[in-house]
Design a protein with these regions (language model features):
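Conserved Rossmann-fold NAD(P)-dependent oxidoreductase catalytic core, especially the SDR/UDP-sugar
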Residues: 13, 20-70, 92
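The catalytic Tyr-centered alpha-helix of NAD(P)H-dependent dehydrogenases
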Residues: 14, 69-73, 131-134
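Short, flexible, mixed-charge acidic loops at enzyme active sites
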Residues: 49-57, 107-116
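Substrate-access "cap/lid" subdomains that shape
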Residues: 94-111, 127
């Protein structure tokens, strides 16, 4: 029970930190007249639908609807950005997946998956993914 409580406290701390950090960035954008904010979220912020369910655009983002600290922090930040957009901030959100590129240094989840696959420890791989440089360039257009 104590370990679970610590994990939940840690998770709450992460979500609170993300909320404060992103709220400050959004406040800065509004106060300084930033022309356009492009927030790079993640597919992990999108709640998973039950297997066999048709995928549709999601408009509700909440830490309670996703699993894992990273997903929860991205869902919270995405909700904050979308709320700021409703209040007048010119903002867009993109949801990349499987990005890999220069500077990864073998610590990212996609790199680890590829290394496991090449070492014969993973019998299959996820199709798709995008180069980080291509993703960044498309977000700026």
């Amino acid at each position: 029970m104590l370990i679970r409580a610590r994990k939940e406290a840690s998770e709450r701390g992460l979500i609170a930190h993300v909320a404060r950090h992103d709220a400050n960035i959004l406040k800065f954008c509004s106060q300084c007249g930033v022309g356009k904010l492009v927030y790079v979220s993640s597919v992990h912020a999108i709640p998973e639908k039950p297997k066999g369910t048709e995928i549709a655009e999601t408009t509700t983002f909440s830490p309670e609807l996703v699993r894992g600290d990273y997903a929860k922090s991205k869902a919270m930040a995405t909700a904050l950005v979308l709320q700021a957009a409703k209040e007048g901030l010119n903002a867009s959100v993109v949801f990349p997946s499987g990005i890999i590129g220069p500077g990864d240094l073998g610590k990212g989840s996609i790199t680890n998956m590829l290394l496991s696959f090449l070492a014969g420890k993973l019998p299959l791989a996820v199709k798709g993914g995008y180069d980080v440089c291509t993703a960044c360039k498309s977000n700026l257009r």
